Amino acid sequence: MAGPLPPLNQEAAFQKLQEYYDSKGKDLNIKDLFVKDSKRFSKYSLRLHTQNDGEILLDYSKNRINDEVWDLLLTLAKVRRVNAARDAMFSGQHINITENRAVLHTALRNRGTDPVLVDDKDVMPDVRAELAHMKEFTNMVISGVWRGCTGKQITDVVNIGIGGSDLGPLMVTEALKPYGKGLHSHFVSNIDGTHLAEVLKKVNYETTLFIVASKTFTTQETITNATSAKTWLLEHSKEPESVAKHFVALSTNKEKVTEFGIDSTNMFGFWDWVGGRYSLWSAIGLSICLSIGFENFEQLLDGAHFMDNHFKTTPFEKNAPVILALLGVWYSNFFKAETHALLPYDQYLHRFAAYFQQGDMESNGKFVSKSGKPVKYSTGPIVWGEPGTNGQHAFYQLIHQGTRLIPCDFIAPAQTHNPIAGGKHHKILLSNFLAQTEALMAGKTVDEARTELSKAGLCGNELDNLLPHKVFVGNRPTNSIVVKKVSPFTLGALIALYEHKIFVQGIIWDINSFDQWGVELGKQLAKAIEPELDHCNEVSTHDSSTNGLINFIKANWK
């Protein structure tokens, strides 16, 4: 790749966008744009054709963009060298510059035969060997060959991890519940003992398998939870040998794993070129395999590989991750939008927004460029959301009539896994999905509100007083993503779509999307504070607020 990028706000293409925004862009009205162009939907939407899972539709026509804006945004992507950065990632270059690592979660789902090189070594043989190990173990557990210490078949799987070792597997197992193979999945992440205690109340030691997910096998929260789970098991089994029947490890630290009591043959590894928030495709996905079966896990990989190929080979103007990324830059850096809402209209996707809170905010929540200089423009947005229609009765009020601009992605399947009441529920759900994006775009004018109130029998002061409250400004931007059905393949494609969107935005902002130093400071300070909670003496070594909090907690400890 060429030399360092200039600061984004000094890029000529960015400055042209700023000029256009100031003169015309800020006044673009989505409703008017549809009136002026009868072909707007076909111009600003695309369909991705899968082999067996139908089409994936991305409709981005309900955005504050026109041809001029779009051409300028595409130019920005080109001058920020998104193509070169994408190729560098897929080719195994060390694009994680602060940790000197390659970024190759895409290799984990590489379904082709081409080699993938990291430091001149093809990693695919190791990837395939680990997948084969996962397949063998998964089939043993699901078939009942693997049994607990008393000879009973495994019925429950408890994944103990945190961050990327928890959020991804949890989200996917919830999303793909219709494909479950009969095992009950549980997840423990929080160091709060309540999390583990409540899970242990639900399971039987004779039929429970614990997965300890920690690359180093030293992660404080994970190892503390795993050790307490081990103590619980031994209190019931009374046999140290039972640990090897009820615990497996997702780790690369053989010494620590065997010291814990886990047979090293039941240790599943991954590599330093796999970031935590991109690790569900690796051995970290073992809990997914046990939930949905290895064949369905392969379909998840296939879907992600499909999106990888789309991202690698498709021109920017038809490239779904690039399109979503550029729209986000448009709103973050010009309209000063601070948040982005992910709104899946499918209950199985109820953890999707939480998963991409980490995926986006941990990746692009950075204030310095790759060269270490503070940036003078906005970077990663605050990402949040809930499933529809729950969100409609909670926070949509602010999206519709609040003072903040909140771009939204609406996600829905055309088909449901649960067509109860003859499909009535799903029809109501989809009617709301469709109505919300139309309402956010069109709003309700003063005249429309007045007519509506008049028809309801209001007049005079009563009508005039209520009228302002019934007006919707509209012009709220949305994307709509529709899949045929939430399947392992389409879910894999959706996850990869957002992964690559985040990557493209990081390139445009010239930040490193693959480290997370912001996680470290609080952990360092917690280690210093923890010993201060061991004694009853008042503490005075911190600021007055922290001292006061520590001393209050200690006074109320018992």
From Swiss-Prot:
NCBIfam families documented for this protein: PRK00179.1
Keyword list, A-Z: Cytoplasm, Gluconeogenesis, Glycolysis, Isomerase
Protein name per UniProt: Glucose-6-phosphate isomerase
Residue ranges crossing the lipid bilayer per the database entry: none
HAMAP family xref list: G6P_isomerase
Organism from which the protein derives: Drosophila melanogaster
Keyword Isomerase appears in the UniProt entry: yes
Family: Belongs to the GPI family.
